[in-house]
From Swiss-Prot:
Belongs to the FPG family. This is Formamidopyrimidine-DNA glycosylase. CDD domains: EcFpg-like_N (cd08966). DNA binds at residues 91, 110, 151. It comes from Pseudomonas entomophila (strain L48). HAMAP family: Fapy_DNA_glycosyl. One of its GO terms (biological process) is base-excision repair. Keywords: DNA damage, DNA repair, DNA-binding, Glycosidase, Hydrolase, Lyase, Metal-binding, Multifunctional enzyme, Zinc, Zinc-finger. Involved in base excision repair of DNA damaged by oxidation or by mutagenic agents. Acts as a DNA glycosylase that recognizes and removes damaged bases. Has a preference for oxidized purines, such as 7,8-dihydro-8-oxoguanine (8-oxoG). Has AP (apurinic/apyrimidinic) lyase activity and introduces nicks in the DNA strand. Cleaves the DNA backbone by beta-delta elimination to generate a single-strand break at the site of the removed base with both 3'- and 5'-phosphates. Its cofactor is Zn(2+).
């Protein structure tokens, strides 16, 4: 599933080609995503100029003069720019055609993504309850420490809770916990302030590094320019269960936490 770095990579890739451009037509070949694409999307968006492209958590907000297209890549989706008129292949559900001669094409083989329309996107039901962005000053270790008091859940699902902080998905939670030396199974409420301060720093560092590398391509993620991400080459623990730790050589263990696989080093993480 594309996580925050992959979505931010997509945003950075498509924004320069969208902002200031006018939409000439929207072609929807299949409306059946996680939620149906609005039947009047073409009417609402065509003729409008794209003002900005923003990201909130794992949602892309394509802001027009009036209204915003809210897009989510789901489990396997991508948005990329192609030449106008390029024939559509299987699973290529939506084309947003631009007067510039390019079009933004949405592909989603598993159809778990979304394309919705809103006049007030930040107050949309999908976005209004989200926590702070991890790469801003609104998120820090003190927030993690305070929100974790009295919580008996494991620390990994705690930091993956979008009400606590957005965008810390399975890959980056696994990597940040390793970097901070924290066992993902530990109770969130039993971790000290000092360790949460360290964890917040590592969450920011890991996410920033992943964005710099264009995200992580494990299966079918590609950025807005059609290129894969390269952060998978930097992974220390994610997806490496049973292999030796890159730091100490101990065999990495894999357990289930919150229905997700979690890999950790029993020596480096306490």
């Amino acid at each position: 599933m594309p996580e925050l770095p992959e979505v931010e990579t997509t945003r950075r890739g498509i924004a320069p080609h969208l902002v200031g451009q006018r939409v000439s037509r929207v072609v929807v070949r299949d409306r059946r995503l996680r939620w149906p694409i609005p039947e009047d999307l073409d009417v609402r968006l065509s003729g409008q100029c794209i003002v900005s492209v923003e990201r909130r958590a794992k949602y892309l907000l394509i802001n027009a003069e009036v209204g915003t297209l809210i897009s989510h890549l789901g489990m396997s989706g991508n948005l990329r720019l192609v030449e106008l008129g390029l024939p559509a292949a299987k699973h290529e559900h939506v084309d947003i055609e631009l007067e510039s001669g390019l079009m933004l094409r949405y592909t989603d083989p598993r159809r778990f993504g979304a394309m919705l329309w809103s006049l007030d996107p930040l107050n949309h039901e999908l976005l209004i309850r989200l926590g702070p962005e991890p790469l801003t000053d609104l998120f820090d270790g003190e927030r993690l420490f305070q929100l974790s008091r009295g919580r008996s859940m494991a620390v990994k699902p705690f930091i993956m809770d979008n009400a606590v902080v957005v965008g810390v998905g399975n890959i980056y939670a696994t990597e940040a916990l390793f970097a901070a030396g924290i066992d993902p199974r530990r109770e969130a409420g039993g971790i000290s302030r000092a360790r949460y301060l360290k964890l917040a720093i590592e969450i920011k560092r890991v996410l920033a590094a992943a964005i710099e590398q264009g995200g992580t391509t494990l299966r079918d993620f590609i950025g807005g320019d059609g290129q894969p991400g390269y952060f998978q080459q930097e992974l220390f623990v994610y997806g490496r269960g049973g292999q030796p730790c890159k730091v100490c050589g101990t065999e990495l263990r894999e357990v289930k936490l919150g229905q997700r696989a979690s890999v950790f080093c029993p020596k480096c993480q306490r």
